[in-house]
Amino acid sequence: MNITKKNSLFASVPVFLVFLCMGFGDVAGTLTDLVKNEYQLSNFMAGFIPFSGFIMFGILSIPFALIMARNSKKLILSIGLFIAFLGLIIPTIFGFSLFVVILLSILLLGAGAALLQVAGNPIMKDVSPEGKYSRNLSFGQFVKAIGSLSGALIPAAAAMWWGMDWKILFPIYSVALAVAFILLIISKINEEKTGSDLPSLESCFQLLGQNKNIALIVFGIFVYVGAEVSMASKLPSYLETNFGLKIEELGVASVGLFFLSIMTGRFLGGLILNWIQARTFLVISALLSLVGVAGLFVGIQSVAIVSIVIIGLGFANVFPLVFSITVEKYPGKTNELSGLMVTAIVGGAVIPVITGFVADHISITMSFIVPAIALIYVLYLGLTQLKPNIQ
């Protein structure tokens, strides 16, 4: 399309930086154990940390997708960066002595990340050459994974080298958000119009009710995100329970290994999509993830570590692939689809509760059946619901 050709390489720089900041929202999961120990929280109270980080996806995504349709994607990105920045500076102003301050900070960071997801995924299409949207979205998710990984690695590095703890994340993230905001404001991005009719709240839900295919795809995003958060939150406990590896010593490292694998997988995915179709790659990714989850049931430490890497590589491209395939399948419904699919990220607040219930009543290992079922559903989507000729 001509409009994408008008966007220079420089226009994509702030968009990729937005994806980096988008990854900061995943800190809600990686910091849970560290914050729990800091404030001596119960497991129930600690559960409000990831809940706060993901609940805003369910509340804000559709309303801001509708606002985006009437204004611009760039405006929504700017608002998202500002809200996330506001959340990160709150502890700096009020201090870290109260847990409620951290909870409010994570809530606003999650709200900002929700807006970045709503506008970031479709605006990537505006700065991508024709036919390269899936590839660039995978690269964008690779950059996002760097942001996610930083939530696990920066606290560990700060403790090792500077004698500091997880609180160092807040000023570092604040600076990154400020830089992204400035670069975005001064950039010029030609945005593609995605339909003659402005979407409404009613049209979004009508899309779910009238198009079974879209409803199944949105549910796929819901269960996939829930599976990813479940894996990230349960892997440290799995390693301690089965192999005696202490969460205090290896918890962050195990989550870091998972996100490092995701980051690597997204980079490789951006390259692989130059040669194979997005739908084929989605099926391969789902199968690879299922192989990795199966490896967790073997009960051998070395196999478990390799399985974590395999799971991360498989998980890496599921979200950007499903998103990009769907948007290209229904080009006139980009705003509604963006709102619906980002709303479905609220699965990250719901599915882990089910996984935790299974872990409490059966075992940590058996709890991975829950994300495995989610992956089987993603495989079903790739094989049956994401064919180009299905309308």
What are these regions (language model features)?
Residues 10-36, 121, 231-236:
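Extracytoplasmic
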Residues 28-29, 211-256, 263:
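Extracytoplasmic gate region of multi-pass secondary transporters
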Residues 59-99:
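Conserved MFS/SLC helix-loop-helix module at the cytosolic interface between two early adjacent transmembrane helices
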Residues 60-73, 265-277, 359:
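Helix-to-loop junctions at the C-terminal end of transmembrane segments
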Residues 99-115, 303-317:
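Hydrophobic core of transmembrane alpha-helices in multi-pass small-molecule transporters
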Residues 105-142:
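Cytoplasmic helix-loop-helix junction between adjacent transmembrane helices
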Residues 132-155, 339-351:
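Glycine-rich segments within core transmembrane alpha-helices of 12-TM secondary carriers
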Residues 140-189:
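Helix-loop-helix hairpin linking two adjacent transmembrane segments in secondary transporters
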